[in-house]
Amino acid sequence: MMMNKNVLSSILFFMLIGSVLVESRPLGLTKTEEKFVASLFDGLSLGSIKDSGPSPGEGHKVVDRKDTFRFVKHSGPSPSGPGH
């Protein structure tokens, strides 16, 4: 029983230390490292999203309302054919 308690406490201790090491991050970045990290994120799409503005296009805006029902799907049985 004592052996199991020691093993269990050792496992829990290493799991605690491991979780602290995994969740930690460096605290003091130097100016060189900050510039490197900033340039890294500027090249990614996240930097592009943050710097982008509204699109100049119309998007999905419906221009002519009388044409809206032309694209309605007519449900019903499918035409008979060879199938799959």
UniProtKB/Swiss-Prot annotation:
Residue ranges of the region described as Disordered: 50-84
GO-annotated cellular components: apoplast
Post-translational modification: Contains 4-hydroxyproline; hydroxylated on Pro-77 and Pro-79.
InterPro entries the record matches: PIP2/PIPL1
Biological processes, Gene Ontology terms: innate immune response; regulation of root development; response to auxin
Signal peptide, first to last residue: 1-24
Residues with 4-hydroxyproline modification: P77, P79
Keywords noted in UniProt: Apoplast, Hydroxylation, Secreted, Signal
Biased composition (Basic and acidic residues): 58-70
Subcellular location: Secreted, Extracellular space, Apoplast
Role played: Endogenous secreted peptide that acts as elicitor of immune response and positive regulator of defense response. Amplifies the immune response triggered by flg22, the active epitope of bacterial flagellin. Acts as a negative regulator of root growth.
Protein's name in the database: PAMP-induced secreted peptide 2
Organism per entry: Arabidopsis thaliana
